[in-house]
From Swiss-Prot:
One matching Pfam family: NanE
Name this protein carries in UniProt: Putative N-acetylmannosamine-6-phosphate 2-epimerase
PANTHER family: N-ACETYLMANNOSAMINE-6-PHOSPHATE 2-EPIMERASE-RELATED
Record's catalysed reaction(s): an N-acyl-D-glucosamine 6-phosphate = an N-acyl-D-mannosamine 6-phosphate
UniProt gene name: nanE
Entry's EC annotation: 5.1.3.9
Family of the protein in this entry: Belongs to the NanE family.
Pathway the protein contributes to: Amino-sugar metabolism; N-acetylneuraminate degradation; D-fructose 6-phosphate from N-acetylneuraminate: step 3/5
InterPro entries: Aldolase_TIM, NanE, RibuloseP-bd_barrel
CDD domains: NanE
UniProt GO molecular function: N-acylglucosamine-6-phosphate 2-epimerase activity
Task performed by this protein: Converts N-acetylmannosamine-6-phosphate (ManNAc-6-P) to N-acetylglucosamine-6-phosphate (GlcNAc-6-P).
Enzyme class: isomerase
Length: 228
């Protein structure tokens, strides 16, 4: 069974934590991933080679691997270079996710995707923010497309995710699996994404984002207290 068939119609849980969080320890990320898989997740999405390696030892479902890297001269940060992809693959990722937006990057997108295919033997998930960028990524060889970066780039920051219209456009115009990722905040929303044609649904913050969730609750309660 190929990777796309394994995940079709299922929930992919993004198990990540801020670098300064106690949850960012590899063994804790691995425990999150294992808990998600035990409850039915068909795959997990993991950041950094250290976390991928720990998760690989804990679960046998597909791992979408990435490495967020801050490069001073470039806005792209999700697996921006081939060297990053090499480390992600070596750690045990089954598919490599990367930023496929039109923003400036250290290496040409098509070259990066081709090298991942040819030298690492791994499929590529293109994280995009628009139909145009998705189409360009597929033309460059991307195997899957995710709506991951909608709402997080300069051209889309004015609109919070998810974008149901973008998802519908991607499903209509592209022939590769489309993963709905970003802004999915309830089971109802996840089901809606599948109903619109998403191949699978990725959920992170609403399931594993303890740090952000606590901050949101605290801010809401503080605002209410300040008004009283």
């Amino acid at each position: 069974m190929n990777l796309a068939t394994q995940i079709r119609g299922g929930l992919i849980v993004s198990c990540q934590a801020p670098a300064d969080s106690p949850l960012a320890a590899p063994e804790i990320i691995a425990a999150m991933a294992k808990a998600a898989v035990l409850r039915g997740a068909v795959a997990v999405r993991i950041n950094t080679p250290a976390h991928i390696q720990a998760v690989r030892q804990a679960v046998n479902v597909p791992i979408i691997g990435l490495w967020k890297q801050t490069l001073p001269a470039y806005p792209v940060y999700i697996t921006p270079r081939f060297a990053d992809a090499v480390a992600v693959a070596a750690a045990g990722a089954d598919i490599i996710a990367l930023d496929a937006t039109a923003r400036s990057r250290p290496e040409p997108l098509q070259d990066l995707i081709q090298r991942i295919h040819n030298e690492l033997g791994k499929p590529v998930m293109a994280d995009i923010d628009s139909l145009e960028n998705a189409a360009a990524a597929v033309a460059a060889g991307a195997d899957w497309v995710g709506t991951t970066l909608f709402g997080y780039t300069e051209t889309t920051a004015h609109t919070p995710p998810p974008s149901w219209s973008l998802l519908s456009q991607l499903v209509e115009h592209l022939s590769v699996p489309i993963l709905s990722e970003g802004g999915i905040a309830s089971p109802t929303m996840a089901a809606k994404a599948l109903g619109l044609g998403a191949w699978a649904v990725v959920v992170g913050t609403d399931i594993t984002g303890i740090d952000l969730k606590v901050q949101q609750y605290v801010a809401a309660l503080k605002a209410n207290t300040d008004l009283s």
